[in-house]
Amino acid sequence: LDTPVTLPEEIFPALQAQNASLAGFQAGETATVRDLLYGAMLPSGAECCEALAREVSGSEEAFVARMNQKAAELGMTATHFCNPTGLHDPEHVSTVRDMARLTEAALQNETFRKLFTTERYTVPATNCHPQGFTMHSTLLSQLDGTELHSGRILGGKTGYTGEAGLCLASLAEVKGREYILVTAGAGGNHSTAPY
């Protein structure tokens, strides 16, 4: 998690052309894998996803192949990934059932669970941000004390494209039991309230 990663300049033009959500890292900035994981999970930083994919697998294509292999291992029979960001591609498809399966498996990993349930994270000083900067969860930072009947929302990951609509994978605790809820295709846009 402490491995340094430099964000390559060539990933930014395509992400900006697609109006992708960015965490705030800059081309040539060096941050840790941990910082980029928080950047991917909290503010949906596409630049973090791209940089991590290249760091882990050498290329976006090789990483996507690993994503599809893991999906098959998990029995996600209606899922096919085309990129590490979740940005629209007509062949990049899944279902809420498959996303719930992935969320359940991922939550078994202690590091992922911490990322999924964190409201804010401060990136320490980097070569481009000498004061560091703070990122907030696109879900938890907007809930502001909202509670469920006899429960609470523990964490979640939002997503949005014009084609997919508003999407959400969330973890809640109700009466001492944990529940995963995945929704997709909701109306609105990336600035619509998450509830």
Residue ranges and their predicted role:
Residues M76-H80, H88-Y195:
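Domain-terminus/edge residues, biased toward the C-terminal soluble/receptor-binding domains
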Residues L1-R97, A106-E110:
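Active-site-adjacent loops and short helices of periplasmic peptidoglycan-processing enzymes
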